[in-house]
Amino acid sequence: MRFAKAFLLTLYVALGFFELTAAAQTAAQPSVYAIKGAKIHTLAGPVIDNGIVVIRDGKVAAVGVSVSIPSDAQVIDAVGMELYPGLFDPITQIGLEEIAQVSATVDVSELGDFNPELVAATAVNPASAHIPVTRANGVTHVIAVPGTSGFDSQGGGTIAGQASAFNLAGWTMDDMQIQRSVAMVVNWPSIQTRSFDFSTFSFKEKSYEDAKKEYDKSVNELSDWLTRARHYAQAKEKGSPALFERDLKLESLVPVVQGKLPVLVIADEERDIKNAVEFCGKQNLKMILGSGAEAWKVTALLKEKKIPVILGPIERLPEQEDTPYDKPMTQPSELLAAGVPFAFSSFGTSFSRRLPDYAGTAVAYGLPHDEAMKAVTINAAQIFGIADQVGTIETGKMANLIVTNGDPLEVQTQVKYLFIKGQLTSTDNRHRDLYEQYRKRPQAAH
């Protein structure tokens, strides 16, 4: 009993300290900032030299050259620096996965092939160590996508759940959330005669006939779910609430079949992309293509159907052995030339911090710099329907901003100031802590 009382007393003291610390940190933040002297890249208009951005209550209150600085503003002198919108990673598992090899820290996918009722926001860990590492490179907001973990990005079943957009700062998801559901995630089935089994670390082969049967079965099941969702919506609209039995899975699919919620279809090979586009067309679904390693082969189709692409990491090998080695790096410029909207993404957790590197690599392979910047900011916001909140520096938008000492797509550039939802946010992180720790280690005597 004495031990229990002592434990409870210690717990209460610790919790009280935590609450005081949290309150102190919140209270210490002013609600008004003025960033002056920077070269402002709004991405909504021309570059503003020696401009001023005023932030009030989490949003951009004013931007321009002849802007009055409020008397209650905390002024940040950014002369000689660059000011950009915060970067946006639209397909990641940040907050859903901590250590890939420790299953207790992985909450990317659920058992079963059809889980439309799952929402990524409910599983995001706001205290993930990956969050400060990622935002230190200028990424201020992301979309957590369920069911896209692993080497083949097919770990979450056919319908993996709903993707959620949120900021990379905050105590809880209520603090961080931008939009709870931005897309329904569908891992498009593929006719695979050869696959890698991680349990035996070997390849498994099957006949084309068997692989085709599995593919047809998955597509038919997906079609059946959508048909049932339409019937469910009709029954709910016309039936008596007292007699109506609620089904969360079908209820979650209703916005999809009504065209209110897009489907993020993960597919890479040309055949799979074509099949997915045809299927979504027949079902009248609003499609976004995710990964799209061979999207360059079907640009005319994507443009005709007005389907945007969220590219996976471009520093990768092509899907086919006879494809030019640099095709993943040149694909962004080809999509641009074809008029297909696209954005970059990391498709991971620890590599979300490398998002600006992917865009920089695309610039080296022919993509114009301004288009690369749009592909890590406003493009994804437009694709997922949240461009009214993030993506550019405009009055009334959320103040997710980065102040850098150079081009954010250059590896050596550093983020000097980081604002998320109008709050000056620390760029300290575990990587930097370890760097400082070992940089200061005692030197051996010579």
Annotate the PLM regions.
Residues 8-19:
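Bacterial N-terminal signal peptides
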Residues 99-100, 105-117, 262, 303, ...:
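His/Asp/Glu-enriched, well-ordered alpha-helical/loop segment
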Residues 38, 53, 58, 80, ...:
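Divalent metal-coordination and catalytic microenvironments
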Residues 50, 120, 145, 188, ...:
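Active-site core of metal-dependent hydrolases
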Residues 26-27, 40-52, 64-65, 368-376, ...:
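Acidic, glycine-enriched loop/beta-strand segments at the rims
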Residues 27, 31, 40, 44-84:
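Histidine-rich, glycine-flanked metal-binding segment
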Residues 130, 135-287, 414:
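Polyanionic/metal-chelating signatures
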